[in-house]
């Protein structure tokens, strides 16, 4: 029997790492502190709980870097992608999932695996021996973060993710709102009508911005650094950057036609995306916020169609802790000071569910290979996974290192025509090259 691999944290990264290692024949001990020790953002003790959005973003594997990452994870028989497919919700060209059944299914599959044992406990310090993957995510416990800081001498960087509110569908006024995906994207009627749209004229938009800016906000605790990841900015922070910022961001009106008044062009549009399979819950897209609860209710009810809305969950903020990975990790995701420990997921400085799961997939495979006496190099940088792991383990500038989503800017350049059509061709060239390289890496 091979040595055991210990994995700390059963989020996206830890769950995927455990699955990959166990499928390679390595016994896994999965340590998860929930539900015994909770966090601000989690509601349950389920594995791979989605605490922010319910979307894995674009599923276009030909011209989108996130979609390509989906493709690579499916090719590697990833558990997260398998369960996402099983609990998929209509969302235009995006991959959105029914979050609770998704997490329950991931949990059930891992608990049922004969080579995986689950220990419900907090790991408070970095172990000096054994094979470990730390995948504790953005809410790494204070004790473990302090242990890491003591070992590395490095300050863990901190920023904040904001959580979007969720509305009960039956309380949305569909005489004002209408169903449509932007540019009518999607192959089925469900996909083409996956979003609920609430229009605003200029006067309504200006009043909404005024209310956002004036609303009471949650203050940061003493000693916390008020930094944000740009992909998850609170709407009030976006509004502070300029009054027009929101209508060029999550409230942009392009690609949408008011079903009730097709001749009227909205000045801004608020979109809601289905949050569960039943279609009883919808989250307000891009509306993560740190407004206080009372202020949220008042401000969001200014949105046409949501005047009488009831909220299943209001927005909030949570802290995100991550390593300066280019300084601390080697190209196999091992801690240079203690190579028996790997890191995976958001704690390494990737941002997003899919990116976190992908780094878990790599860490699990590389750790298992090492235990089995094999050397498994990271995927080539031409692949989505390879581009991400190269970025966090040395490609990024250490002094200015910040969490990163996967994007084609991380890939080695490719020659292609310029212009709008040329850009689409170039993205296709990136994904064609990546798929060939990833297939070769999988078969090696």
From Swiss-Prot:
Q: What InterPro entries does this protein's entry cite?
A: FAD/NAD-bd_sf, MnmG-rel, MnmG-rel_CS, MnmG_N, TrmFO
Q: Where in the cell is it found?
A: Cytoplasm
Q: Where does FAD bind?
A: 9-14
- Annotated coiled-coil positions are none
**Keywords of this protein's UniProt record, alphabetized?**
Cytoplasm, FAD, Flavoprotein, Methyltransferase, NAD, NADP, Transferase, tRNA processing
Asked whether the keyword NADP is assigned, the reply is yes
Quote one Gene Ontology molecular function term: flavin adenine dinucleotide binding
Kindly report the protein's main subcellular placement as a broad class. cytoplasm
- Reaction(s) the record says it catalyses: uridine(54) in tRNA + (6R)-5,10-methylene-5,6,7,8-tetrahydrofolate + NADH + H(+) = 5-methyluridine(54) in tRNA + (6S)-5,6,7,8-tetrahydrofolate + NAD(+); uridine(54) in tRNA + (6R)-5,10-methylene-5,6,7,8-tetrahydrofolate + NADPH + H(+) = 5-methyluridine(54) in tRNA + (6S)-5,6,7,8-tetrahydrofolate + NADP(+)
Sorted alphabetically, the Gene Ontology BP terms of this entry are:
tRNA methylation; tRNA wobble uridine modification
Q: What is its EC number?
A: 2.1.1.74
Signal sequence residues: none
Q: Which Pfam families match?
A: GIDA
Listed cofactors: FAD
Query: Where is it found, in Gene Ontology cellular component terms?
Result: cytosol
* Keyword NADP (UniProt): yes
Q: What does this protein do?
A: Catalyzes the folate-dependent formation of 5-methyl-uridine at position 54 (M-5-U54) in all tRNAs.
Stated family: Belongs to the MnmG family. TrmFO subfamily.
NCBIfam families in the cross-refs: gid_trmFO (TIGR00137), PRK05335.1 (NF003739)
Q: What is this protein called?
A: Methylenetetrahydrofolate--tRNA-(uracil-5-)-methyltransferase TrmFO
| Species the sequence originates in | Cereibacter sphaeroides (strain KD131 / KCTC 12085)
Corresponding gene?
A: trmFO
């Amino acid at each position: 029997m091979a040595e055991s691999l210990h994995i700390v944290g059963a989020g996206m990264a830890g769950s995927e790492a455990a699955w990959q290692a166990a499928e390679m024949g390595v016994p896994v001990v999965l340590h998860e502190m929930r539900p015994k020790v909770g966090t601000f953002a989690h509601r349950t003790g389920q594995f791979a709980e989605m605490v922010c959005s319910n979307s894995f973003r674009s599923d276009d594997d030909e011209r989108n870097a996130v979609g390509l990452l989906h493709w690579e994870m499916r090719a590697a028989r990833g558990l997260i992608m398998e369960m996402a497919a099983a609990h998929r919700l209509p969302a235009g060209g995006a991959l959105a999932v029914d979050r609770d059944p998704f997490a329950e299914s991931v949990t059930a599959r891992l608990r049922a695996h004969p080579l995986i044992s689950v220990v419900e406990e907090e790991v408070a310090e970095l172990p000096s021996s054994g094979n470990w993957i730390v995948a504790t995510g953005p809410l790494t416990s204070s004790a473990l973060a302090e242990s890491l800081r003591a070992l590395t001498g490095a300050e863990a960087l901190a920023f904040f993710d904001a959580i979007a509110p969720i509305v009960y569908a039956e309380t949305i006024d569909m005489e004002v709102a209408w169903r449509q995906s932007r540019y009518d994207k999607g192959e089925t009627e469900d996909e083409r009508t996956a979003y609920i749209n609430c229009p605003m004229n200029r006067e309504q938009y200006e009043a909404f911005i005024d209310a956002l800016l004036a609303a009471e906000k949650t203050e940061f605790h003493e000693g916390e650094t008020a930094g944000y990841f740009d992909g998850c900015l609170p709407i009030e922070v976006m509004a502070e950057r300029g009054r027009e910022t929101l209508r060029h961001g999550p409230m942009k009106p392009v690609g949408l036609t008011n079903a009730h008044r097709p001749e009227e062009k909205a000045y801004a549009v608020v979109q809601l995306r289905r949050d569960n399979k039943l279609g009883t819950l919808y989250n307000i897209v891009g509306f993560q916020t740190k407004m206080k609860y009372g202020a949220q209710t008042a401000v969001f009810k200014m949105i046409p169609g949501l005047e009488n809305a009831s909220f299943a969950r209001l927005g909030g903020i949570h802290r995100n802790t991550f390593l300066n990975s280019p300084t601390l990790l080697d190209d196999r995701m091992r801690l240079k000071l203690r190579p028996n420990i790997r890191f995976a997921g958001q704690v390494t400085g990737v941002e997003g569910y899919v990116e976190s799961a992908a780094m878990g997939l790599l860490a699990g495979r590389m750790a298992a290979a090492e235990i089995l006496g094999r050397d498994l190099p990271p995927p080539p940088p031409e692949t989505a996974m390879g581009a991400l792991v190269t970025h966090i383990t040395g490609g990024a500038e250490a002094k200015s290192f910040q969490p990163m989503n996967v994007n084609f800017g991380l890939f080695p350049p490719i020659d292609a025509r310029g212009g709008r059509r040329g850009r689409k061709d170039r993205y296709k060239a990136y994904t064609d090259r990546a798929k060939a390289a990833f297939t070769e890496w999988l078969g090696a």
